[in-house]
Swiss-Prot record:
This is Membrane protein US15. It is a multi-pass membrane protein. Pfam families: Bax1-I (PF01027). It is found in: Host membrane. The gene is US15. InterPro entries: Bax_inhibitor_1-related. Belongs to the HHV-5 US12 protein family.
């Protein structure tokens, strides 16, 4: 179909007249819809930024005020002897939220409660793990978060499907490359399988950032921006904990399998 001065001429030769005012109205409607999507995105990720700033300030104040005897304490630092216990909280909270929202309407109070529930494992991590390890995991998570959400928010609307295909292709290639590197190492098969599974979960969580950003841009009304912000924040914290889980997996398996081949 080609356009000629207000006329739309299909390939079969039929001429359809479209007044210029309707064309301008369609263009204005699309522009306003895109502006509204940007407003929702700004409110949502602005709220995520405030949550990150508040949580960082809370954890920094706690680590500064905590007694020196708490750091790497044998009873408090479960991340060395049984690190998986720390990660039970985010996993169960994600499962509970999914089950709750499938049978009940979305409730911001429930999400805020489970957001605060992530603070104890983060405190344990800050007290028991090396600060360089925590900072590197946080930077990796934020880089993946900003990359996926940036593509989703800045790309034109007509490339939504192409965005999804590109992001999923990149995630698949990244996962394949990491698995190839893992399989070529001289570790035990148990360690290789568990590590590959953890990498898969993390890659899925990273790709979820892109889908969440698309949902915020195209589907979330402005009055539900806070609810969307809490969901995005939960996925961000969950991914951070999964990245730390992978980084501490070697110590975990050494403790339980007592193998020197890892």
């Amino acid at each position: 179909m080609r356009r000629e001065k207000g006329f739309q001429v299909p390939t079969d030769g039929t001429v359809i007249y479209v007044p210029p005012g309707i064309q301008e109205t369609r263009l204005a409607t699309r522009s306003l819809a895109w502006v509204d999507c940007c407003r929702v995105a700004l409110h949502t990720y602005g709220a995520v930024g405030w949550q990150l700033a508040g949580l960082t300030a809370l954890l920094s104040a706690f680590c500064y005020a905590a007694p020196a005897t708490w750091f790497h304490h044998s009873r408090l630092c479960l991340t060395e002897s049984s690190p998986s216990l720390v990660f039970v909280i985010p996993v169960t909270s994600v499962i509970f939220i999914h089950c709750y929202e499938t049978s009940h309407p979305s409730n911001i109070g429930v999400l805020l409660f489970y957001t605060l529930l992530h603070v104890p494992p983060l405190i344990v991590i800050c007290l028991c793990l090396d600060g360089t390890l925590v900072i590197s995991a946080a930077l990796f998570t934020l880089l993946a978060f900003l990359s996926c959400t940036g593509v989703a928010l800045l790309a034109p609307e007509r490339t939504v499907r192409r965005q999804i295909v590109v992001i999923h292709a990149l995630i698949t290639l990244t996962f394949t490359a990491i698995v190839v590197v893992i399989l070529r190492r001289g570790w035990s098969w148990c360690f290789k399988i568990v590590l590959s599974f953890s990498v898969l979960i993390t890659c899925l969580a990273v790709s979820h950032f892109h889908e969440a950003a698309l949902a915020v841009r195209y589907e979330t009304p402005l009055e539900r921006a806070l609810l969307a912000a809490v969901k995005v924040f939960l996925s961000l914290v969950f991914t951070l904990l999964m990245v730390l889980r992978i980084m501490t997996l070697r110590t975990f398996l050494q403790t339980y399998f007592s193998s020197d081949k890892l």
